[in-house]
Amino acid sequence: MKFTRMVKPNEVERKWHVIDAEGKTFGRLVTEIATLLRGKHKPNYTPHVDCGDYVVVINASKVKVSGNKESKEYHRHTGYFGGVKSEKLAELREKNPEKLFKLATRGMLPKTKLGRAMLKKLKVYPGSEHPHTAQVKGN
């Protein structure tokens, strides 16, 4: 008789994935990133253990969006009265693509400590250069 075996946090093997965002559709790319961060692509996926991999996104400022999503607004609140600030997706992509990717990916991960730990494994860079070449070569 076979039993399903749950993986323990110290048994998880993490890989580094480099994803080039140039010319790719934003939403489809973010779902792929969320799957890798969560670890659902692995046969030993366990929901209560962070078994995901590290993801490095390069050329984040050259990602493509379809339809009229360029005008989609992201809202945040400063904490003061009347302190609602809004930014359009196009502005956010030019100014701070890391924030754009983290906001979109965060919505696809669990809203718990586990989700925050998974999001820390996402590294986003607007250009093609990144400081993680040593880790990526090790895979």
Swiss-Prot record:
HAMAP family, sorted: Ribosomal_uL13 (MF_01366)
Listed SUPFAM superfamilies: Ribosomal protein L13 (SSF52161)
Protein name, entry field: Large ribosomal subunit protein uL13
Gene Ontology CC annotation, any one: cytosolic large ribosomal subunit
Species assigned in the record: Nitratiruptor sp. (strain SB155-2)
GO process terms (BP): negative regulation of translation; translation
Keyword Oxidoreductase: no
Keyword terms of this UniProt record: Ribonucleoprotein, Ribosomal protein
Biological role stated in the UniProt entry: This protein is one of the early assembly proteins of the 50S ribosomal subunit, although it is not seen to bind rRNA by itself. It is important during the early stages of 50S assembly.
Molecular function terms from GO: mRNA binding; structural constituent of ribosome
Gene3D superfamilies xrefs: Ribosomal protein L13 (3.90.1180.10)
Protein's UniProt keywords contain Isomerase: no
InterPro entries: Ribosomal_uL13 (IPR005822), Ribosomal_uL13_bac-type (IPR005823), Ribosomal_uL13_sf (IPR036899)
Similarity field: Belongs to the universal ribosomal protein uL13 family.
Known partners and oligomeric status: Part of the 50S ribosomal subunit.
